[in-house]
Amino acid sequence: MALKERLGTVVSDKMDKTVVVAVENRFPHPIYQKTVSRTTRYKAHDAGNTCRVGDRVRITETRPLSRSKRWTVAEVLSHSPKAQEVST
């Protein structure tokens, strides 16, 4: 079985070893054909607490880690400019 992957933006990093990632899904409306965007928020495991708000990340599906956590952060694609200023 292939693992599911999603690309998204970190919207919250206030929990220990957990981040909330917003993934935007765009699709045409079945009747009107207008592009509709839906945002889904996933809780993902961040083992090193390296992600900050605004970072672009890739998350992969995994076994259940808690009641609401079924995704892990596979890699950080780009850091938020705001997060880079704080760390330096």
UniProtKB/Swiss-Prot annotation:
PROSITE patterns: RIBOSOMAL_S17 (PS00056). Gene3D superfamilies: Nucleic acid-binding proteins. GO terms for molecular function: rRNA binding; structural constituent of ribosome. GO terms for biological process: translation. The keyword rRNA-binding applies. Pfam families: Ribosomal_S17 (PF00366). InterPro entries: NA-bd_OB-fold, Ribosomal_uS17, Ribosomal_uS17_bact/chlr, Ribosomal_uS17_CS. Part of the 30S ribosomal subunit. Belongs to the universal ribosomal protein uS17 family. One of the primary rRNA binding proteins, it binds specifically to the 5'-end of 16S ribosomal RNA. HAMAP family: Ribosomal_uS17_B (MF_01345_B). This is Small ribosomal subunit protein uS17. It comes from Prochlorococcus marinus (strain MIT 9313). The lineage of its organism: Bacteria, Bacillati, Cyanobacteriota, Cyanophyceae, Synechococcales.
